[in-house]
């Protein structure tokens, strides 16, 4: 049996995440009282004829604060029964959440006559702290549209075939900010930039012209060898510490050339020694 617990601040994309999981064969329950989590997991484990072997539940700020405070012990009770359980925590920056609520005109569950939307969003972070602290995977949805979020959920959760550590090698551009969920960040802006070659500017690091140019640069090859050597040494230590997800981010200026090229090569190299390695290019379509 596999259990995914979805949480996060209101407006961060929890409903979308549950919809994706439901579309992919999960039995989904929204707004589960946290205190019922161990009982639900146990019943699902014992009565597979009633529930699918894949279950996803949403636990968020609609719960009583006292139940949210108990989340660590409730989660441990589930895991003591040897259930394959992942905690997904979604979030976005305050400005984005405010904008999303303004656009949809939906009411935040914590707003009252004396508590503004901005205050409710801030208070929600504290309420959900016990869940956020134990999240196996945190996703920042600030810059993701609906379709990108759906694709990210599929990549990170549904492409994880078995218990163990899922590794993601992600390219990005510093001009759009660093990925907040990255565990390791490598800055490759010091390398020769194909952008300044007019014939390469409109190509990406996935295309032969850019790949050939970068492969011929000694500094690029040296950077690649150093990063792969470091990761081959230390990523198995992350896996040994029972981490479910590890994100390695490779950043250049725009996220189109150098970081894309290196992320592809590094991801391919890591697949020789690690089981579950995925590659994603955050800014390639922008």
Curated annotation (Swiss-Prot):
Positions annotated to bind ATP = 8-15
**Pfam name, any one:** PapZ_C
Keywords from the named record: ATP-binding, GTP-binding, Nucleotide-binding
Annotated positions binding GTP: 60-63
Instruction: Name the family the entry cites.
Output: Belongs to the RapZ-like family.
Q: What PANTHER family does its record include?
A: RNASE ADAPTER PROTEIN RAPZ
- Role: Displays ATPase and GTPase activities.
Could you identify this protein by its name?
Nucleotide-binding protein PA4465
* Species of the source: Pseudomonas aeruginosa (strain ATCC 15692 / DSM 22644 / CIP 104116 / JCM 14847 / LMG 12228 / 1C / PRS 101 / PAO1)
């Amino acid at each position: 049996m596999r259990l995914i617990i979805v949480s996060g601040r209101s407006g961060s994309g929890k409903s979308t995440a549950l919809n994706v999981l439901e579309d992919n064969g999960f039995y989904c329950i929204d707004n589960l009282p946290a205190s019922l989590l161990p009982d639900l997991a146990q019943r699902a484990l014992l009565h597979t004829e009633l529930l699918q072997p894949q279950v996803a539940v949403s636990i968020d700020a609609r719960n009583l604060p006292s139940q949210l405070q108990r989340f660590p012990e409730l989660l441990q009770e589930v895991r003591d029964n040897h259930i394959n359980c992942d905690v997904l925590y979604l979030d976005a920056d305050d400005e984005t959440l405010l904008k999303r609520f303004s656009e949809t005109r939906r009411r935040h569950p914590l707003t009252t006559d004396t508590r503004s939307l901005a205050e409710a969003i801030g208070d929600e972070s504290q309420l959900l702290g016990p869940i956020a602290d134990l999240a196996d995977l945190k996703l920042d949805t600030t810059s993701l549209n609906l379709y990108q979020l759906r694709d990210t959920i599929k990549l990170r959760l549904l492409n994880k075939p078995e218990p163990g550590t899922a590794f993601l090698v992600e390219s990005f551009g510093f001009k759009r900010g660093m990925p907040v969920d990255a565990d390791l960040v490598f800055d490759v802006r010091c390398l020769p930039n194909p952008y300044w070659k007019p014939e390469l500017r409109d190509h990406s690091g996935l295309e032969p012209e850019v790949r050939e140019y970068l492969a011929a640069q000694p500094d690029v090859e040296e950077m690649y060898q150093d990063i792969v050597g470091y990761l081959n040494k230390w990523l198995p230590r992350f896996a040994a510490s029972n981490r479910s997800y590890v994100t390695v981010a490779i950043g250049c200026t725009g996220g189109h050339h150098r970081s894309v090229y290196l992320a592809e090569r590094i991801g391919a190299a890591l697949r020789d020694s690690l089981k579950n390695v995925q590659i994603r290019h955050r800014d390639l379509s922008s």
